[in-house]
Amino acid sequence: MSDGKKHVVIIGGGITGLAAAFYMEKEIKEKNLPLELTLVEASPRVGGKIQTVKKDGYIIERGPDSFLERKKSAPQLVKDLGLEHLLVNNATGQSYVLVNRTLHPMPKGAVMGIPTKIAPFVSTGLFSLSGKARAAMDFILPASKTKDDQSLGEFFRRRVGDEVVENLIEPLLSGIYAGDIDKLSLMSTFPQFYQTEQKHRSLILGMKKTRPQGSGQQLTAKKQGQFQTLSTGLQTLVEEIEKQLKLTKVYKGTKVTKLSHSGSCYSLELDNGVTLDADSVIVTAPHKAAAGMLSELPAISHLKNMHSTSVANVALGFPEGSVQMEHEGTGFVISRNSDFAITACTWTNKKWPHAAPEGKTLLRAYVGKAGDESIVDLSDNDIINIVLEDLKKVMNINGEPEMTCVTRWHESMPQYHVGHKQRIKELREALASAYPGVYMTGASFEGVGIPDCIDQGKAAVSDALTYLFS
């Protein structure tokens, strides 16, 4: 490398790659490291799924709309960028579960669908008497035998029965991953539930004991919620990182086609004809793209065989009087058993008042789920019409929306199927042996939320610097 400096290349400019570049630059400046840094992004823009549209006074998030405040890496990144004055918490309100065509309030005290307060669970209309009785079996059932992994569905059905799973737990948990809970890995998504069961035997009693005071549904009594975003839209986060990357050479609209050994370092072939040499590489690209770069590594088959779900979301803006809701709240999720194409809906102007102009209603509906992704390929008009038809079953909507925005994310939701953790472990061990100094990380590996991705980017920086300078 020039002037005897080491060279690190980051592949992928989503939030994982951007966080890696930002914190790598911080290390270079603070420790005066002899290091050059390059970031290569396949699309014309950085930021990945973080994308904000401002239209007719509305602030529309095409991808994630927020992050959990208690996961400290995201608020910390915002502060490190000097954007803390833009942080806003969600307004709290009642959330609902739609079963058939009835909206049921989320039972108070439910943590990811697991009851920690008995009275609201007993009185809810979400479950039949027999469904409640089956869930109560959790109090006397033994803990499951030690297992390396199992599906979310297998675990929760054994603890609380099918009805609670299908009417409450499944709509909440599968919505995060757009996945099938009977395939999703417990240990790669919510291992804390397994650990709670193993320690306390009863999942309900264990959750009740370990639940932080003032969390979950208790927040509905407060004005501020547990999620945060930026008042100008989350894309501000991306733009500010890009603006502050002073030491990083950034290629946009450029793909890495191959990563191979080149003497004691690595050679990266780009589709623009440029070849980069690197001493260490951090790969944060989606797993299918990452697999294509290292096709000669046998363990890369784990990534090639990993499925991703396609989803879409639709933002709809109305004059306030055009939408009348029987229920006050911030939104609802939908039981898979219900005859609806949408999987959830956020009453965005209630949850994020800054996102809609005064006197306007902003709804955001979600479509596409594991096993039912064809709707994503329909035209904008067809998707909008299907969404409106579903929403009109739940609320009174008069007239057409004055603003619409359809966003498709093809093969965007990596599926952590049973055994995912072990497969990733095997891949990383093979990578460390055959390609020391090359690190794969990001949403396809250990968490899809913004804080999870930031954490993974920071961990990769630590690994790369240890490899290069220890």
Curated annotation (Swiss-Prot):
UniProt note: pH dependence: Optimum pH is 8.7 (for protoporphyrinogen oxidation).
Catalytic activity: coproporphyrinogen III + 3 O2 = coproporphyrin III + 3 H2O2
Disulfide bond annotation, renumbered to this chain: none
SUPFAM superfamilies, per the entry: FAD-linked reductases, C-terminal domain, FAD/NAD(P)-binding domain
UniProt keyword Nuclease present: no
Superkingdom, natural source: Bacteria
GO biological process: heme biosynthetic process
Topological category with respect to the lipid bilayer: Peripheral membrane protein
A single cellular component GO annotation: plasma membrane
Effect caused by changing P64A: Decreased affinity for protoporphyrinogen-IX
Annotated family: Belongs to the protoporphyrinogen/coproporphyrinogen oxidase family. Coproporphyrinogen III oxidase subfamily.
PANTHER family listed in its UniProt record: PROTOPORPHYRINOGEN OXIDASE
Record's subunit section: Monomer.
Name of this chain's protein: Coproporphyrinogen III oxidase
Record organism: Bacillus subtilis (strain 168)
